[in-house]
């Protein structure tokens, strides 16, 4: 009986070692491809929120990490990608969190030109209700296009609210919390850029190259 148990333990140990080795080998073989795919996804999103005609630098490499919980919605440092055209600063793509979504955090990226006018907004991740709150996703509706061409005039700019709250942005039938959260997050990100642009341009590039 004892011999049988030892054999079983040995078989299990060998199986665990083999499984670990397989996972390690698989990771080693695929990590470069995964990193490449992530880089391509990032490039695609950056070019959607900061149009190609607005920059000629490698935007994903011109990245700084900024920590500002009030403006960017996270205690963690968030990436800001600095655009330039013909050697001059021409805008940015700012990642931020809307912490007050209906189902939790909504991660967004906001593109602006050097005058803090919005050039694009995309939702990077969310857990909002399908058929209701998920209309913030560009793959579902073009709702985020309502931000295009707009800027924030002050931290108290009342236009930056959903219509139910007296602002200019549509809410969704049966889902006001989600668009309200996104509008507030975009507003904070744009205002942060508008009031800190000179400071941001003095910071060293400190993101890991993706």
From Swiss-Prot:
Q: What class of enzyme is it?
A: translocase
Primary place of residence?
membrane
Q: Which cofactor does it need?
A: FMN
> What EC number(s) would the UniProt record show?
7.-.-.-
Keyword Phosphoprotein part of the UniProt annotation? yes
Q: Keywords, A to Z?
A: Cell inner membrane, Cell membrane, Electron transport, Flavoprotein, FMN, Membrane, Phosphoprotein, Translocase, Transmembrane, Transmembrane helix, Transport
Q: Which GO molecular function annotations are given, in alphabetical order?
A: electron transfer activity; FMN binding
| Spans traversing the lipid bilayer | 9-29
Know the name of this protein?
Ion-translocating oxidoreductase complex subunit G
Write out the similarity annotation.
Belongs to the RnfG family.
Q: Which GO terms describe its biological process?
A: electron transport chain
Kindly state one GO CC term assigned in the UniProt record.
plasma membrane
């Amino acid at each position: 009986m004892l011999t049988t148990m030892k054999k079983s333990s040995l078989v299990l140990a060998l199986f665990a070692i083999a499984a670990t080795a397989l996972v390690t080998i698989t990771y080693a073989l695929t990590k470069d491809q995964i990193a490449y795919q992530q880089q391509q996804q990032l490039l695609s999103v950056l070019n959607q929120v900061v149009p190609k005609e607005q920059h000629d630098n490698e935007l994903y490499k011109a990245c700084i990490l900024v920590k500002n919980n009030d403006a960017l919605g996270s205690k963690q440092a968030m990436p800001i990608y600095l655009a330039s055209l013909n050697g001059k600063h021409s805008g940015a793509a700012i990642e931020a969190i809307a912490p007050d979504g209906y189902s939790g955090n909504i991660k967004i990226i906001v593109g602006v030109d050097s005058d803090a006018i919005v050039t694009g907004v995309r939702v990077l991740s969310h857990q909002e209700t399908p058929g209701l709150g998920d209309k913030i996703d560009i793959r579902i509706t073009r709702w985020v296009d309502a931000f295009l061409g707009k800027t924030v005039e002050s931290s108290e700019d009342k236009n930056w609210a959903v219509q139910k709250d007296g602002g200019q942005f549509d809410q969704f039938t049966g889902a006001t919390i989600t668009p309200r959260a996104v509008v507030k997050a975009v507003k904070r990100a744009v205002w942060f850029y508008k009031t800190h642009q000179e400071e941001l341009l003095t910071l060293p590039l400190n993101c890991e190259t993706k």
